[in-house]
Amino acid sequence: MGLRAGGALRRAGAGPGAPEGQGPGGAQGGSIHSGCIATVHNVPIAVLIRPLPSVLDPAKVQSLVDTILADPDSVPPIDVLWIKGAQGGDYYYSFGGCHRYAAYQQLQRETIPAKLVRSTLSDLRMYLGASTPDLQ
């Protein structure tokens, strides 16, 4: 069973419709999942559910730490699947962005910039298969 997130998420940076800048590989707008989402939220790291173990390159994590300290706006936000449980609970799943996640953890930040991708239990099942929890 996943953790249930409480409290409101805080928005970061510019509002909806603001220019996004370049995403991975120089593409405008970020990832395939969140390319059309302009709003970036400061999501509490404590509410993120990361069910898959990460394989990290320590040098890449350190490079991101250095970049976050020097120019945090140049680091793209992570994508977070936002799923409503059967009884209205909010669940925030993160599968990618493992190096960015580790960098923010190393910096002992309480939040991480993220784009919330509204998703469903069916979407989550695509990632987790039979291991998908019964979200309340």
Swiss-Prot record:
Annotated keywords: Antioxidant, ATP-binding, Cytoplasm, Disulfide bond, Magnesium, Methylation, Nucleotide-binding, Oxidoreductase, Phosphoprotein
MF terms in GO: ATP binding; oxidoreductase activity, acting on a sulfur group of donors; sulfiredoxin activity
Stretches the record annotates as Disordered: 1-30
Cofactor: Mg(2+)
Class of this enzyme: oxidoreductase
InterPro entries, sorted: ParB/Sulfiredoxin_dom (IPR003115), ParB/Sulfiredoxin_sf (IPR036086), Sulfiredoxin (IPR016692)
Substrates-to-products reaction catalysed: S-hydroxy-S-oxy-L-cysteinyl-[peroxiredoxin] + [protein]-dithiol + ATP = S-hydroxy-L-cysteinyl-[peroxiredoxin] + [protein]-disulfide + ADP + phosphate
Residues the record lists as Omega-N-methylarginine modifications: 11
Protein name per its UniProtKB record: Sulfiredoxin-1
UniProt binding sites for ATP: 97-100
Record-level GO cellular component terms: cytosol
Origin: domain of life: Eukaryota
Source taxonomy: Eukaryota, Metazoa, Chordata, Craniata, Vertebrata
Skewed-composition ranges (Gly residues): 14-29
Family: Belongs to the sulfiredoxin family.
Purpose: Contributes to oxidative stress resistance by reducing cysteine-sulfinic acid formed under exposure to oxidants in the peroxiredoxins PRDX1, PRDX2, PRDX3 and PRDX4. Does not act on PRDX5 or PRDX6. May catalyze the reduction in a multi-step process by acting both as a specific phosphotransferase and a thioltransferase.
Residue numbers of Phosphoserine PTMs: 31
Composition-biased stretches (Low complexity): 1-13
GO biological process, one term: response to oxidative stress
Subcellular location: Cytoplasm
